[in-house]
Amino acid sequence: MRRVMLGVYAAVGLAGLTAGTTVTRAQHAHGGGDGHAQGHLAAQACASEFEKVVGEGRGFGLAFAADQNGYPGPMHVLELKDRLTLSADQEANARELMHAMFTESRPKGARLLEAEAKLRRLFAERVADEAAVRAAVAEVERARTEVRLVHLLTHLTTRDLLTEDQRRIYHEARWGALAPAQ
């Protein structure tokens, strides 16, 4: 199983290197090449999606460590409720967990987004120096930690709502059979 995961990570890493090479070639191509702009536009789109999702209280992958390893989140459990054949109680409990998670995560997400904006402003306003950047990055990471903890801890609780069979079905639906879901 670890060999399978290592293979997946190696393939993803290799794909990233290949994509990086393609972008580099496009940047250095004669005639101006627009790979550079496309790469930055893709990064900006990702940053915009991050802001939208985190602003809504969602985790934007901050709980992958849990989800990939058999600790599902309530939102995805509800998305798969028919396949999981959730009982009425399970569905109600998952909804409560999701509501509580979003309620706690939204203000923490807003703090994270504000900390990220503050870091960007340091550079945009040309006032960045080592001390200011270190302080701003520390603030960003404190805020990110708080958002991430909300999501990871909710995944811990959500796991207990499901039977072993439901966890297996969930994991296969979300991740294939790459990791144990016990």
Spans of model-derived segments:
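Charge-rich (acidic/polar
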Residues: V23-Q182
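Bacterial N-terminal signal peptides that target proteins for export
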Residues: M1-Y9
